[in-house]
Amino acid sequence: METCYCIEPQWPADELLMKYQYISDFFIALAYFSIPLELIYFVKKSAVFPYRWVLVQFGAFIVLCGATHLINLWTFTMHSRTVAVVMTTAKVLTAVVSCATALMLVHIIPDLLSVKTRELFLKNKAAELDREMGLIRTQEETGRHVRMLTHEIRSTLDRHTILKTTLVELGRTLALEECALWMPTRTGLELQLSYTLHQQNPVGYTVPINLPVISQVFSSNRAVKISPNSPVASLRPRAGRYVAGEVVAVRVPLLHLSNFQINDWPELSTKRYALMVLMLPSDSARQWRVHELELVEVVADQVAVALSHAAILEESMRARDPLMEQNVALDLARREAETANHARNDFLAVMNHEMRTPMHAIIALSSLLQETELTPEQRLMVETILKSSNLLATLINDVLDLSRLEDGSLQLDIGTFNLHAVFKEVLNLIKPVTLVKKLSLTLHLGLDLPVFAVGDEKRLMQAILNVVGNAVKFSKEGSISISAIVAKAETFREIRVPDFHPVPSDSHFYLRVQVKDTGSGISPQDIPKLFTKFAQTTVGPRNSCGSGLGLAICKRFVNLMEGHIWLESEGLGKGCTATFIVKLGIAEQSNESKLPFTSKIHENSIHTSFPGLKVLVMDDNGVSRSVTKGLLVHLGCEVTTAGSIEEFLRVVSQEHKVVFMDICTPGVDGYELAIRIREKFAKCHERPFMVVLTGNSDKVTKESCLRAGMDGLILKPVSIDKMRSVLSELIERRVLFETS
């Protein structure tokens, strides 16, 4: 009997397969049920997922698939009809849901693919933005380095410090192995190694400036990569075991240095450049980047500007010492000029007073002699003395006026005056001379010329008298015509003078005065000289007597009145035309302003004598005191004199109607004396009229007299006619005062 040692299996093969299917269906169902749970969890966490219904369908499909696998566990054995119905229902639902999901995916998948495309696009854009941000950061870093380097370079104006600082800062910022600067020699044919980063005193290597590599760099305004073996790049000895780093070179313009004589710099007749060479570390894979090259270019430009400023500073420092010496000399000359000017003014002030005092005696006594019985020969001599004295007084006035015009102390005395009366008075003053010389004298006043105007009456009359007087002086025969009109705007176009710019206005007008004569004429080349002080013509009859001050003073008066004066003549023997234009204000009211300070000379005075008028004269100069007393006695006045302040205060009384005093008195000046008189006579009608008799003709004296309460001012010298006119005016004012 055969024995079988076979081991019976624990489970039959069919049963084993069945168990595997059970287990597989169970895990499949478990997986199908877990997937929807995971989808639901992640969908709830996502706030922007756009396909929620698709996930619901897909989840239902998976759940139904899992359910079919779960139900299938009961179909491997005998099962009831109910299980079959459930299984069938589950499969039908699974089929429906799966088909619906499949149809939905047909529409969803393209969108999902486009989402992926947009994702890739966004990734590319993000990468591009990252690159741009990196570029911006690089540019910001470059800008920061440029600002830092510029600050370091501009922190000094010493050119050696500028160049050394540039190399040090570039080497630190760019981590350079070496940096050098080649400067052109004085001949301009070579470049010399002048500054390096690591060598304190580099050996003066030179290379020809016409090397191709140098020409290449100089012809470009950008940084240029050059060979490490180039002569300008061989800055340090290299062993053969390593590879040299990359080298760039850039030109440095030497701006405007040809204008400055810098001793050890090249003579730059044309545009020249220095050469800056920069070397990266050896045995490294580092290369020059774009922003580093831009940094080098910007720094080269900044170095050029800084060197230009340094050159300017060196030249200014070199020129400073001579300028300081000149300033010291100019300051000394200014002080000397001021001292001389003060001395001149003091001299003129003293001479003015001291010269007018004897002139006062001469003119006063001569005028007194004229009114006595004289033989024709004696009268002629007295008239000659009087005319010469008046001429000398005029010269004194001219010199003083010119002095004050030159130092700017003379100012116009503006007031309202009768313009027509000024011309008539000039005519009356000039007519006697023209009658003697048998000259025809005519005056034409424009119909539109205002009767009253605002300006300086005295200076205007002086200017007219100067011009007319010159015409009379240099005319032996013929005629002289004076015309005065309001200058129109079209006449200004004829005058082409840079300093004369008339501006029409409703508040002022321009007076045009023209004087024509048929006299000796002027050579054209002499016309410009006539407005220079002490200048006279050198040819022709105009080289006659005169101080040469009249037209010079007249021109300055016209300039003060914002006008212009000029002469015209066709030549010698053809006469002359003098024209001037001055600016005058338009008077608001047609009445002549009364200036209490100015004594006006009335030729036809109401009173020819003043019998019984008590007058007190105070003057420390005995001659002047006696002369003034003589004039007043001749006019019938009862005169009391005083030679000092004490005597004056002792004798002055209410009986005295007029007081003549000299303000230049030792001890107490006339201004303080006037104040004492006002204090002594409290009531105005008891106080005598106070008239200053002085040789000081400046405006300050007049203003001081006005502040002190003076009633009038008379300039020495004084003639008998002038004294008669002054007393007539004072008597009129006294009568008017008492009746008021």
From Swiss-Prot:
<feature type="transmembrane region" description="Helical">
    <location>
        <begin position="23"/>
        <end position="43"/>
    </location>
</feature>
<keyword id="KW-0902">Two-component regulatory system</keyword>
<dbReference type="InterPro" id="IPR014525">
    <property type="entry name" value="ETR"/>
</dbReference>
<dbReference type="InterPro" id="IPR003018">
    <property type="entry name" value="GAF"/>
</dbReference>
<keyword id="KW-0067">ATP-binding</keyword>
<comment type="function">
    <text>May act early in the ethylene signal transduction pathway, possibly as an ethylene receptor, or as a regulator of the pathway.</text>
</comment>
<keyword id="KW-0479">Metal-binding</keyword>
<keyword id="KW-0597">Phosphoprotein</keyword>
<dbReference type="GO" id="GO:0005789">
    <property type="term" value="C:endoplasmic reticulum membrane"/>
</dbReference>
<dbReference type="Pfam" id="PF02518">
    <property type="entry name" value="HATPase_c"/>
</dbReference>
<keyword id="KW-0418">Kinase</keyword>
<comment type="similarity">
    <text>Belongs to the ethylene receptor family.</text>
</comment>
<dbReference type="InterPro" id="IPR003661">
    <property type="entry name" value="HisK_dim/P_dom"/>
</dbReference>
<dbReference type="Pfam" id="PF25487">
    <property type="entry name" value="ETR1_N"/>
</dbReference>
<dbReference type="GO" id="GO:0038199">
    <property type="term" value="F:ethylene receptor activity"/>
</dbReference>
<dbReference type="InterPro" id="IPR004358">
    <property type="entry name" value="Sig_transdc_His_kin-like_C"/>
</dbReference>
<feature type="domain" description="Histidine kinase">
    <location>
        <begin position="350"/>
        <end position="588"/>
    </location>
</feature>
<feature type="binding site">
    <location>
        <position position="69"/>
    </location>
    <ligand>
        <name>Cu cation</name>
    </ligand>
</feature>
<comment type="subunit">
    <text>Homodimer; disulfide-linked.</text>
</comment>
<dbReference type="Pfam" id="PF01590">
    <property type="entry name" value="GAF"/>
</dbReference>
<feature type="modified residue" description="Phosphohistidine; by autocatalysis">
    <location>
        <position position="353"/>
    </location>
</feature>
<dbReference type="InterPro" id="IPR011006">
    <property type="entry name" value="CheY-like_superfamily"/>
</dbReference>
<keyword id="KW-0675">Receptor</keyword>
<keyword id="KW-0256">Endoplasmic reticulum</keyword>
<keyword id="KW-0812">Transmembrane</keyword>
<dbReference type="InterPro" id="IPR001789">
    <property type="entry name" value="Sig_transdc_resp-reg_receiver"/>
</dbReference>
<dbReference type="GO" id="GO:0046872">
    <property type="term" value="F:metal ion binding"/>
</dbReference>
<keyword id="KW-0808">Transferase</keyword>
<feature type="modified residue" description="4-aspartylphosphate">
    <location>
        <position position="662"/>
    </location>
</feature>
<dbReference type="InterPro" id="IPR005467">
    <property type="entry name" value="His_kinase_dom"/>
</dbReference>
<dbReference type="GO" id="GO:0010105">
    <property type="term" value="P:negative regulation of ethylene-activated signaling pathway"/>
</dbReference>
<keyword id="KW-0472">Membrane</keyword>
<dbReference type="Pfam" id="PF00512">
    <property type="entry name" value="HisKA"/>
</dbReference>
<feature type="domain" description="GAF">
    <location>
        <begin position="158"/>
        <end position="307"/>
    </location>
</feature>
<keyword id="KW-0547">Nucleotide-binding</keyword>
<keyword id="KW-0186">Copper</keyword>
<dbReference type="GO" id="GO:0005524">
    <property type="term" value="F:ATP binding"/>
</dbReference>
<keyword id="KW-1133">Transmembrane helix</keyword>
<keyword id="KW-1015">Disulfide bond</keyword>
<keyword id="KW-0936">Ethylene signaling pathway</keyword>
<feature type="transmembrane region" description="Helical">
    <location>
        <begin position="53"/>
        <end position="73"/>
    </location>
</feature>
<feature type="binding site">
    <location>
        <position position="65"/>
    </location>
    <ligand>
        <name>Cu cation</name>
    </ligand>
</feature>
